[in-house]
Amino acid sequence: MDPARKAGAQAMIWTAGWLLLLLLRGGAQALECYSCVQKADDGCSPNKMKTVKCAPGVDVCTEAVGAVETIHGQFSLAVRGCGSGLPGKNDRGLDLHGLLAFIQLQQCAQDRCNAKLNLTSRALDPAGNESAYPPNGVECYSCVGLSREACQGTSPPVVSCYNASDHVYKGCFDGNVTLTAANVTVSLPVRGCVQDEFCTRDGVTGPGFTLSGSCCQGSRCNSDLRNKTYFSPRIPPLVRLPPPEPTTVASTTSVTTSTSAPVRPTSTTKPMPAPTSQTPRQGVEHEASRDEEPRLTGGAAGHQDRSNSGQYPAKGGPQQPHNKGCVAPTAGLAALLLAVAAGVLL
């Protein structure tokens, strides 16, 4: 290879290398965002914010703030960092039985662009001068911007509830507020006076925001409602019915069986004895009618009638076996005696 061609090839190699290096440098340059977490404090103040480089594929910086207000105060949670999704802004207001919440979410696609929301000023209007309202007699534990350690059991301060803005605050609340943004989740407890006395694990949600909890009735009843269930008095209670008495069941069963059982035997067995008992009964009645005549006339016929009474028992008595061969001579003798008696009378 001549020197001119060799120099040209080297120049092309160097040019391609520089272009490749520039491309790799441009692709490796990550998005930079501010990062901080604020939990009812100054965690996102300018002197506490940090700058972070986002992972490859992350195209937006995000910042979110959620403010909660009770009738005794307000606090806010905030998160800044690398986000996901599309650039834009989303605001929403929520109300949970008199607890107010406001959420702001903003995302942008430039370096260090997520410091536009003013987190030092409150996002909600002041709760007002509570001394201007007379207490209504209910007291509740209050957790407004307190840490979870400071809001345990009966440790929080006790506040007197009052009615404001034409609303009655006679219930106590125990719950949590949670804010999730930039792959970070922060949460704080919330306690205070609310308008509902019987809510059970109610909640409201917004973009990456949740406010939930339970209500109770009575002063200082909100020391711990996490594992308790309450039922509204407006719902009919469950009533346990007494078991039925055994005597009632037994009598009902006996009546049913005693009524139905005799019907079948009588309907099936009653025709059976009819042919066997009908013929002897007719024979007895016929012989009785024949014996009645001599008994009225007296004499030997009466003795004959008494002698035949042993062979044919009375109606309803036990049937005795007898000799059928002697029936004809006895009947002939009775007829002869009857003829003799009639001749004597004439």
Curated annotation (Swiss-Prot):
Residue positions bearing lipid (GPI-anchor amidated cysteine): C326
Organism: Homo sapiens (Human)
Cellular location(s): Cell membrane
Glycosylation sites: N118, N163, N176, N183
CDD domains in alphabetical order: TFP_LU_ECD_LYPD3_rpt1, TFP_LU_ECD_LYPD3_rpt2
Proregion span(s): 327-346
Biased composition (Pro residues): 234-246
Name assigned to this protein: Ly6/PLAUR domain-containing protein 3
Comp. bias (Low complexity): 247-269
Example GO molecular function: laminin binding
Oligomer and partners: Binds laminin-1 and laminin-5. Interacts with LGALS3. Interacts with AGR2 and AGR3.
Tissue: Expressed in placenta, skin and urothelium. Found in suprabasal keratinocytes of chronic wounds. Weak expression is found in esophagus and peripheral blood mononuclear cells. Found in the majority of primary and metastatic transitional cell carcinomas (TCCs) and as well in breast cancer tissues, but not in adjacent normal tissues. High expression is found in the tumor component of some noninvasive superficial lesions and in invasive and metastatic urothelial cancers.
Membrane protein topology class: Lipid-anchor; GPI-anchor
GO biological process: cell-matrix adhesion; negative regulation of smooth muscle cell apoptotic process
Induction line: Up-regulated in migrating keratinocytes during epithelization of incisional skin wounds.
Function description: Supports cell migration. May be involved in urothelial cell-matrix interactions. May be involved in tumor progression.
Alphabetical keyword list: Cell membrane, Glycoprotein, GPI-anchor, Lipoprotein, Membrane, Repeat, Signal
